[in-house]
Every structure is written in structure tokens, then in C-alpha cells.
């Protein structure tokens, strides 16, 4: 993520998190920085699963930032990618990063005169931005027509790329050790957190 993003907010201030979630959206791993961002990802992942139930496919990618559906602030835009192995949804990779602008009445999203959330930034409820590996250009255009800075498009592509790297690395593990071993270790992790 840090090697592909262009914004100093992400690559220098490190105002982002990454995470790995099981097929149900339960947290398996997350970066240590900014727990407020990281801990908001699991509930959003579950929200996306529910919202798109029956319409989640290999190659899909979702965007989300909506404070009314579990987001923490509109400038923190999350990307989720489902991971399929042998036709089964086994995990999700996710990245959430603070974007320099995501629309709204003033540049940067910090509007001290705002009296409602619509004046702060563009609200992005759970939306499928890539459908089965094909970018939904119409949705992309709608979002970024409302954003002042071109750099945000590059940073969102960096978030998408980081999710793809996470997917690729998890699939390497699954091919090497198998889904049964993954499930055993996943369950051991959940049991350890209960103690």
C-alpha cells in the first residue's frame, strides 16, 4: 500500500489500515496502527455480506465510507475484496485509508459550518465497484466526478491493489496447506481470543 499510494496522508502519515477477515467477516488479522479504523472494518464487512447476499462473486470489489452504515468518517474510504478458494468464499481482504478529498461542500471534508453529513463529503454506502473482475466504470465515474483531487483515484487504486496482494498471498497459503488446515488455524485463533 505504502509503495503504490501517492498521497502523503497514506504513505507518510500512514493514515490507513489493512485487514484479513474470514468468509463471515470475522477479524483474522489487522495492522496495528489506528485501531479506530481497523476495528470498524469487521462490522462493515458483515454489512457488505448482508447487503449483497447472493451477489458476491470471485473478482468483486466493494467501496464503503458511509457513517450511517458503520463507517467512522466519510474521508476514510474502505475497500473490500472477497477471497474465493475452490468456489467457496473463505475470506475478505480489506484496506481503509483517509482520502484527501471525497467531495462535500469544502475541500478536504472538514467543514466547520456543516449542519448535516451531506455537507461534509460524498456518502458511499456499500457499493460494488468491480463486478466479477470488471470495473464498473459508471460507478467509478459517479464517485470521482464528486472528488476534487485526481490523486484520490490513484490512492483508491492503491487500496484495491493492496487487497489484491492480500488475496494472492492468502491463496498461496491455501494452495500449499489446504482449506482444512486454514479452518483449523482460524478456529484456534478465535478460541484464543475467547480466553
Enumerate the language-model features and the residues they cover.
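Short, small/polar residue-rich loop motifs at catalytic or cofactor-binding pockets
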Residues: 12-15, 75-77
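Regulatory sensory and allosteric helical modules in signal-transduction proteins
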Residues: 26-30, 42-66
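A short, hydrophobic, proline-anchored segment that marks a local hinge/packing element in signaling
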Residues: 76-86, 94
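Gly/Pro-rich active-site capping loops and adjacent beta-alpha segments
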Residues: 89-145
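N-terminal leader/propeptide and maturation segments of large enzyme subunits in energy/redox metabolism
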Residues: 123-195
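Short, basic/aromatic recognition patches
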Residues: 1-13, 49-53, 63-70
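Anionic-ligand anchoring segments at beta-strand to alpha-helix junctions in alpha/beta enzyme folds, i.e.
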Residues: 15-44
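A short, polar/charged loop-to-alpha-helix boundary motif
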Residues: 35-48, 100-109
Amino acid at each position: 500500500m505504502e509503495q503504490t499510494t501517492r498521497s502523503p496522508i497514506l504513505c507518510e502519515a500512514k493514515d490507513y489500515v489493512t485487514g484479513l477477515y474470514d468468509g463471515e467477516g470475522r477479524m483474522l488479522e489487522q495492522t496495528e496502527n489506528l485501531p479506530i479504523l481497523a476495528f470498524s472494518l469487521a462490522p462493515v464487512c458483515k454489512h457488505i455480506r448482508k447487503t449483497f447476499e447472493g451477489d458476491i462473486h470471485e473478482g468483486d470489489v466493494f467501496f464503503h465510507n458511509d457513517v450511517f452504515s458503520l463507517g467512522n468518517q466519510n474521508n476514510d474510504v474502505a475497500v473490500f475484496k472477497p477471497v474465493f478458494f475452490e468456489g467457496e468464499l473463505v475470506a475478505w481482504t480489506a484496506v481503509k485509508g483517509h482520502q484527501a478529498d471525497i467531495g462535500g461542500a469544502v475541500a478536504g471534508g472538514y467543514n466547520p459550518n456543516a449542519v448535516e453529513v451531506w455537507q461534509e463529503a460524498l456518502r458511499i454506502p456499500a457499493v460494488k465497484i468491480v463486478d466479477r473482475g470488471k470495473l464498473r466504470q459508471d460507478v467509478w465515474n459517479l464517485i470521482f466526478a464528486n472528488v476534487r483531487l485526481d490523486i484520490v483515484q490513484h490512492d483508491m487504486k492503491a487500496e484495491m491493489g493492496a487487497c489484491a496482494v492480500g488475496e494472492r498471498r492468502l491463496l498461496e497459503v491455501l494452495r500449499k496447506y489446504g482449506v482444512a488446515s486454514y479452518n483449523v488455524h482460524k478456529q484456534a485463533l478465535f478460541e484464543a481470543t475467547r480466553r
